[in-house]
Regions:
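Ribonuclease/tRNase effector modules and their secretory precursors
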Residues: 1-105
Length: 105
């Protein structure tokens, strides 16, 4: 797995793609993790819309395919820092991979 300190994807394009709950495309894991925090689609989209470039943490390659890049952001919320990870997708413009509390590692 490779990491880099520059975003692979345009944050504003990501936010535009997820501008409403109807547009939210996420993995089951991301949806379940968000639900454990009490977040539904409306709340997830609300948090995603607050993301800023300064929240960027790293870009990393997928564990399964080193050619697929994923951007990771640590996003402040009323529940603390959230770990948000997304990638480009063939069918939809982007796919939300993770939405959970950031571990204190």
């Amino acid at each position: 797995m490779t990491d880099k300190r520059k975003p692979t994807y345009d944050l504003e394009a990501f936010k535009a793609a997820f501008s409403s709950p109807a547009n939210l495309r996420a993995t089951g894991t991301a949806i379940r993790s968000a639900a454990q925090l009490g977040y539904g689609a409306v709340e997830i989209v609300g948090i995603l819309q607050t993301m800023e470039r300064t929240h960027f943490y790293k870009s990393m390659t997928s564990y399964g395919d080193h050619r697929i890049w994923q951007d990771v952001y640590h996003v402040p919320s009323s529940d603390g820092l959230l770990y948000v990870k997304f990638t480009a997708d063939v069918v939809t413009e982007f796919l939300l991979l993770s939405f959970k509390e950031k571990d204190n590692d």
